[in-house]
Structure formats: structure tokens, C-alpha cells
Amino acid sequence: MHKIMAINAGSSSLKFQIFTMPGEEVLVKGLIERIGLPDAIFNMSFQNEKIKETRAINDHGKAVEILLEQLKAHQVINDLSEITGVGHRVAHGGEDFVTSCVVTDEVVKGIEAVTNLAPLHNPANIIGIKTFRELLPNAVSVAVFDTAFHQTIPQENFLYALPYELYEKHHIRKYGFHGTSHKYVAGKAAEVLEKPLEKLKIISCHLGNGASVCAIEAGKSVNTSMGFTPNAGLMMGTRSGTIDATIIPYLVDELGYSLDEVMHMMSNESGVLGVSGISSDFRDIEIAAKEGNSRALLTLRMFTGQICNYIGAYASAMNGCDALLFTAGVGENSPLIRQMVTEQLSYLGVTCHVTKNNAGDMIISNDNEAVKVCIIPTNEELMIARDVEKYAKQTIG
């Protein structure tokens, strides 16, 4: 038995879990928020105990130091050497990283080389990697790429209809994201349905503040809604999703926005927040919709309609669908969103049992339907830990 830590470093946050492997038991989990501010928040829960502290945490390096100190202070671990591996979620691996890998100096350079493809995500991921390598030098560090699962997407599905040399010389193409989540829920669905993953055609809907749809055939990603960046595809909490590209120069040339202002608008002021004018949180939107707010209702119709467009396209491309999956914060917790999606898909043989849906059952389609509709809670941290364990075993025997 050994202890594996899964890390998800954001620009001002650090999410963590420690698993005992191979039993996959969660030993501790937590979140450090508002890093860089004097009132940063440290959250940690283990056994029946929860800790929440507000304190100054200047940077990610200090956050990691405090985390390791707290783990020892509360006897979650007695010595840092007990942590045999650390897995890091990395948003973008470009075309070079097609699978998880042990972190070396060369790997760090490779991740840094594609930072321009994920400027909001990769820099924080790199800070997390460097800090843990410094403070836990004997632990195996593994990078787990959100883009890796989508490297099986065929060229006709990942290329943009731009001059081909832009792909050859500059690697401009669809990469896709949420790969770790889509991979996990597909495998879990196969277990739930008691069918071989290799025999299933699955459409996975990862619906949270970020959202994407993925077509999975025989356990491999064959298409996904996100693209060159995580801003493409569905409208999201604050992201516009895919729009007509010529809107951007129109905003700049005709309406006087700077390019930076447009990009900030598309990433931080659009999507659910932009359309509703209320919030980026679907819980707030659903409350407003029930109260009759027309823009909240419009937001729900737009979001679910876009999801259905992708589902229909992917079911057609795969010549069928055996399972439709809902996962992540909205997908797992919003009966209304699931209902609005499924009621538009009757032509595919999709059904939604009202009682099962409202109860959050794992299978919410009517009995004996060909297309199984499932709620599968995602567990990206466990997927990261599993990847780390493979490499840790090779190192520690």
C-alpha cells in the first residue's frame, strides 16, 4: 500500500486528494483558494474532521508548504516520504503529449512550449509541478494531460478548414479538453451497464462551469465540442463557446473594442452570464427561470439546445448511441437540464424517467430502452491517481 497525491493547480487555487493505492481509498482531500491574497482559504477534510483556515498565502510554493505541514500536523502522514507519487492535471499537452508521463526537465520544457495554447491554465499547472518536485524530490511526478484522451480523434474531425500549413507549421487544430473526465465516465458507464467498453457507442456530456460533449466509440474519443482552446463549443458559465469568427474584427473595427477586451469578454463576460445578465451559476438561472425571468429561460433553452445539436451530430457520425452520460456539477445535479436535453432527443430513442431523474438515479432512462441515459459522477482525481500508480509501481516495485 502506498499514498498517491492528485493535484489540480489553478491560477489562484490548489485542489488536492491523497489516495491509498491500490485500494483507491481517499485519505484526505481539500482545496486552497485565493492564493496570492492575505485572506486565502485553506480547506481540508479527512475521516470525520474538517479544517477551514483563513491566512495569507503569497504564492503556490507557500500553499504547497502549508499543505504538507498540515498533513503532518494532523497526522494524515507521519513523514513526507510516505507520498510515493504526485499526479498533476495539465490542461494542454499539444500534439507531443499523447498520454500521461513521468515529469522530467524536458517534459516541463515541453509543457512550457505550449503555454500559449492554454495561457489561463498551463502556467498554474507548471507552478504546481515545479513546487512539488522541489519539496518532494523522491516522489514520482506524473503529468496527466486533459488533451491526451482526444489524441485518437481522426484528422477529418480535428482539422479546421484553414490553409493546411497552419496545422503543419503551427499546430492549429482541435485539441479538446475534459479528457480525463470523459475517459473516466465512459469506463464507469461500461461497468454500470455490464457491457464491454469496446462494444459501446457513448456520448458524454461534461456539464459544469466549463462544458463539453464527447463522442466515444470503443473506448476512444472520436470527436468533442471544445477545440483549439477550452473556449470553443458549448456556451459555458462565462465563455461564449463557438461564435462566427468575424464577430471579433467587427467588435474591434466597428465598435471600438480592443482585441484584449474582446477576448476578455468572450472568456469572462459571455456564456450563461452574458445571456442571462444574472449569474454564471446554473442554480441561480434555474431559480430565476422558475420565477418567470425570460432571459433565464432563454439561457436554458440555448444551452440545452446546443447540447442536443452535438448529441445529434455525434449519434449520426457513430451511426447510433448506446449510452448518453451526464456528469460534472450541472450534469450530475440538475434534473431540469437533463430533462430539457432528453425531451429533445426522442427521435434517437432517448427517454427520461421523471422519478428516476429527480432522484438522481444512476440510470434515468425508462426500462428496456436501447439508449441508456446515465448520471455518472466524474472522478478526475482518481484517474490521475491511477495513472501515477502505474509509474510509482515501476519505481518502488
From Swiss-Prot:
Binding positions for substrate per the UniProt entry: 89
CDD domains the record matches: ASKHA_NBD_AcK_PK
Binding annotation for ATP: 15, 206-210, 281-283, 329-333
This protein's GO CC annotations: cytoplasm
Subunit annotation: Homodimer.
Class of this enzyme: transferase
Function: Catalyzes the formation of acetyl phosphate from acetate and ATP. Can also catalyze the reverse reaction.
HAMAP family, per the entry: Acetate_kinase (MF_00020)
Organism, as annotated: Listeria monocytogenes serovar 1/2a (strain ATCC BAA-679 / EGD-e)
InterPro entries: Ac/propionate_kinase, Aliphatic_acid_kin_short-chain, Aliphatic_acid_kinase_CS, ATPase_NBD
The keyword Ribosomal protein belongs to this UniProt entry's keyword annotation: no
Bound cofactor: record note: Mg(2+). Can also accept Mn(2+).
Site (Transition state stabilizer) location in chain: 178, 239
Highest taxon of source: Bacteria
PROSITE patterns: ACETATE_KINASE_1, ACETATE_KINASE_2
A Pfam family of this chain: Acetate_kinase
This protein's UniProt keywords: ATP-binding, Cytoplasm, Kinase, Magnesium, Metal-binding, Nucleotide-binding, Transferase
Protein name: Acetate kinase 2
